[in-house]
Design a protein with these regions (language model features):
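Short histidine-centered loop motifs in beta-beta connectors
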Residues: 40-42, 198, 204-212
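RNA pseudouridine synthases
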Residues: 1-169, 175-178, 275-279
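Conserved hydrophobic positions within beta-strands
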Residues: 74, 159, 196-199, 232
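Short, low-complexity Ser/Thr-rich regulatory SLiMs
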Residues: 76, 122, 199-201, 259
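Pseudouridine synthases involved in rRNA/tRNA modification
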Residues: 1-29, 188-191, 201-206, 214, ...
Length: 280
């Protein structure tokens, strides 16, 4: 499938592709296979681009997941991105029964003949926003800015107890739990992990918190709040004993980033699920 890129400023075509943090080897292969065109004509990597030019890349891909017929809650879509409000109780990718399979079905119905790519992950019971990326260049771009913490990802969670401070930060490294598979722990030898939070509602037993991730470690929110004595409601793996929910209450509610093609800031919000209530 071919994807078009409207050029805004004069630039060498190779430098333009490198601006997406796309690897030199992949760029070389695009030109070697004659997949890059300018205004309808095949070009080489020495070509200069001008404002208003239409660069076209043929990615020669096909859908790589088995399609699964289910509804998608799509909150944003253009030629480069598909942002979805993920429901609970579904994993991101698997051979047959995952969000990627549902996206594959959507691609098939809409003649989007591209690999199914996601920029980040959400756990099975986490609801909310997840970015699928149609364009390989844009995936490379997002991966870079996720690593440099320039994509803003905000969450809502309900945790046990009342926190001591209305807002704060948890700056504790996270590593593997050697005794329990698929569990993380705070560890001096772990990777840097920083979680910022602010209480938005509370009662004597529970707190609803808004969370901003500075880093994106696996289970970061769940591990950090468990470590400070406030595990997420429903998160049995990390110590919740309340039995108030059959899933942990964590929702990816806002994502914002600069669009690599238009340079506009994209900001998307997903409504908080109905089961996110703490009462009086």
């Amino acid at each position: 499938m071919k994807i078009n890129y409207k050029i805004k400023n004069s630039i060498n075509v190779r430098d333009y592709l490198l601006s997406f943090y796309y690897s030199s080897s992949k760029i070389y292969k695009l030109f070697l296979d004659k997949k890059v065109s300018l205004n309808g004509e095949i070009i080489n990597e020495r070509k200069e681009l001008n404002s208003g030019d239409i660069l076209e890349i043929d990615y020669d891909e096909e859908i790589d997941y088995k399609p699964l017929e289910k509804d998608l809650d799509i909150l944003y879509e253009d030629d480069y991105f598909l942002i979805i409000n993920k429901p609970k109780n579904i994993i991101i990718h698997d051979e047959n029964n995952s969000l990627c399979n549902i996206v594959a079905n959507y691609y098939k119905k809409n003649n989007i003949n591209l690999n199914v790519r996601f920029a980040h992950r959400l756990d099975k019971d986490t609801t909310g926003l997840i970015i699928f990326v149609k364009c390989p260049l844009c995936l490379s771009y997002l991966n870079h800015f996720i690593e440099t913490h320039e994509i803003r990802r905000e969450y809502i969670a309900i945790v046990n107890g009342k926190l001591n401070n209305k807002k704060g930060s948890i700056d504790l490294p996270i590593g593997e739990d050697r005794h329990i598979s698929n569990k993380k722990i705070v560890s001096k030898t772990g990777k840097k992990a920083v979680t910022h939070y602010e209480i938005i509602e509370e009662n004597n037993k529970y707190s609803m918190v808004k969370i901003l991730l500075e880093t994106g470690r696996t289970h970061q929110i769940r591990c950090h709040f468990s470590h400070i004595g406030h595990p997420l409601i429903g998160d049995v793996l990390y110590g919740d004993k309340s039995k108030l929910s059959n899933r942990y209450l964590l929702h990816s509610y806002k994502i914002s980033f600069v669009h690599p093609i238009t340079n506009e800031r994209i900001e998307i919000e997903a409504k908080i699920p109905l089961d996110f209530k703490i009462g009086k």
